[in-house]
Amino acid sequence: ARFAEAILKTCFHYGPIACKEPDNYEARANLMWASSWAINGLISGGSANNWSVHPMEHELSAYYDVTHGVGLAILTPHWMRYVLNDETLDNFVDYGVNVWGLDPSLDKYEIANKAIDLTQDFFCKDLNMPASLTDIGIDDENFEVMAKHAANVKGGSIQGFVNLKPEDIVKIYQAAL
């Protein structure tokens, strides 16, 4: 978990620099380093991956002209809000405290919600990414079929912190409008 947190902190630090200074070698090099570690499988340590947003976003990219990163930036905060509950709370508290540096003495739900808000602000404000599916011209026309496809990739539901059935996925898409 700490390795993943370090990768996120690296991205949160260097992402805005790379956007403001596209020729900044240090920022680009650190983002490439972080990306290599994020994708090579080492941080999962052979265990199941809880990143439920990827199959949901793959459907966005299959149906619409949207890059994977933009789709992830839009969906991730909505997925986080949807799966936040008493069972997942400590994961979000760890994320808020260890990645965003939030005060661990705050109420746990306050930490979790603030971490989600900071994540959305990072994507939308710091990286100037679209904030919603509406911002990129997507409506709810294909949500039902996209949700079924996303869930079928994993045998009928997306496994993760919270298992997501097609109806859950539709709700996340709708929240992202």
Regions found by a protein language model. Give the residues of each.
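Active-site segments that bind and position negatively charged phosphate/pyrophosphate groups
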Residues: 1-118
